[in-house]
Amino acid sequence: MKPNYSIDIAINCFRPGGGMESYTFDLVRGLNAHGIKPTVFAAQIDTTIPEYRQVDTHHVNQKKIPKKLRPFFFSMQLAKLRQNRNIPLIACNPSDYADIFVCGGTHLGYLHNMGKTPNLLDRLIIRRNRTNYSTAKLIMAHSHLMQHELINLYGVPSEKIHVIHPPADTARFYAKPEEIPATRARYGFKDDETIFLFPSTGHTRKGLDLLAEFFEHTDLPIKLAVAGSPLPRPMDNVIELGFCKNMPELYRAADFTIMASLYEPFGLVGIESILCGTRVVFSDNMACTEVMNENAEIGR
């Protein structure tokens, strides 16, 4: 029987991108699997992706708003578009009055871990976060680390927070050992080299500088393969792959997935890598380690 209700989802960009965009796609696919076609409110909408056919959309027009100010106007624009809509809202971005606010990171936590002093824009973001959290009915934290930050940095009541780790798509991410040799050849990975995969759309936060310092000065037969944002400069022993649409095969082709994040509210790449049969080398502050055992396997 088809459900007789709908759900609204708010996200800045409904297109391939970072963690929250990927999470939104997982959410859309999951809702569709239960017969629910959600309505997505976004400032940027990619009409070419398969998930576009699984949703209704409303465009939040921000073209006339200066880029740095757009996130601060989104919530007000969203409220106008949703006027008289008695439909639950899941906020996957900093939107107010959400029925469920998905917390995949806090700005105070980010500044603390990055060692940054807040400027005017940071203070505005922190103020916006406080209204997001105070007006939300429930907050879904991606990790116990996020729960800790919400309670201790923002004073959010603990009973308002539910820790639910992000889902991983096991229909996409799984081991396929028989295809590894051909996939490695296609990416140009040599048989006598150990490949460390570094998926990143935010190199400073993810620890590229620390990793590059080692990889550029080693004589070991190893390579760092960077998938995502462009490199800031050419680097020895570092392969620039650019944005990769087929991450499952890339995980399988690598020998390890590595990250040295300064701040990682969860880090779904760790779970995806292990599902694909590839071991991980992570800094112990990455929240995805909450669901791994000492052998870097997914706990149950």
List the model feature ranges, each with a label:
Residues 151, 168-185, 192:
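Acidic anion/phosphate-binding donor-loop and adjacent secondary structure
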Residues 145, 167:
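Carbohydrate-associated surface elements
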Residues 190-206, 212-215:
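Conserved donor-binding/catalytic core segment of Leloir-type glycosyltransferases
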Residues 267-270, 288:
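Short glycine/serine-rich donor-binding loops of glycosyltransferases
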Residues 279-282:
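Short hydrophobic beta-strand element within catalytic cores of glycosyltransferases
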Residues 262:
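Aromatic "clamp/platform" in nucleotide-sugar-dependent glycosyltransferases that forms part
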Residues 284-300:
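Short acidic/histidine- and often glycine-rich active-site loop of Leloir-type glycosyltransferases
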Residues 243, 250-254:
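Short alpha-helical donor nucleotide-sugar binding micro-motif in glycosyltransferases
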